Amino acid sequence: MKLVSLLTLQFALAHMEMAKPAPRRSKHLKGVTNVDYDMTSPLGGGFSYPCRGFPSGPVSKKYTAGQAINVAIEGGAPHNGGHCQFALSFNGQDFVNIHTVFGTCPQPERSFSVQIPKNFPSGKAVFAWVWNNRVGNRELYMNCSDIEITGGSGMS
């Protein structure tokens, strides 16, 4: 029984995921009925690029152009950090990188402030967190949150 508990704990703490803003099919997203309890798995093995192959969902949060998105990463295997990119997309396929952290993401920090450009267009958008781990197998992780941006001055 103890071995089963330890193995269960190991898988429960496996890898990392974006918790805020709440990603598609996340346990952190209110009202989701088809929760993905494997959000910490890398892409591949049934989870495709972009956004783990999940279709767009409800808007998890609204932001104003120029505002910072407070991002929280959680999980138990940060692989000694790595490289994170935070990006926005309006079509769910083409992403514009708006913030990069080299070498130290998500370790030691797990909270990030990512500013939306002031001239970013208004409308529904996809906010993506992409992570390449530093040690172990080279893996790519991605979580996407459906957001809405208001007050932008660019063209949509």
PLM features: what roles do these ranges have?
Residues 13-156:
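Structured recognition/catalytic domains enriched at protein termini
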Residues 1-19:
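Fungal secretory targeting signals
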